[in-house]
Amino acid sequence: MKKIYISLALIFSLNSISAELWTVSELNERISKLKHDLVLLDVRTQAEYASGHILNAINISHEQVLESPELMTVYKDSQMVVFCRSGVRAGKVIQLLESLGFEDIIDIDGDMLAGSEAGYRMEVNDE
């Protein structure tokens, strides 16, 4: 029952996300120009991640983050880019992280779909 309430709260509060919004072009430019590390958090499933992901992105599925938010505490003081395939799962994770006091979160407009459409190359894991 607790998970249902948390899920409903996240769904109804997605409109209040205050994360900074970058385009995929901005992300690509900032990855290549920034001197400090961005935490690139890919919240898709492991199978989606293996089929193609941004170089140096870490994969923690949105389900893992929602069920065990303590996994994210190591990144609390980092600038973090959160993304998924289309933005729905990333939005849920961003909302949760903001409720936990994370302040420097970036959302990607269009997420992985926009990156693919723009022709950005993805790294693929060979299994």
Predicted feature residues:
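Phosphate-rich cofactor/ligand-interacting catalytic cores and adjacent structured alpha/beta frameworks
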Residues: 42
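Short, surface-exposed ligand- or partner-binding patches at beta-edge/loop junctions that are enriched
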Residues: 83
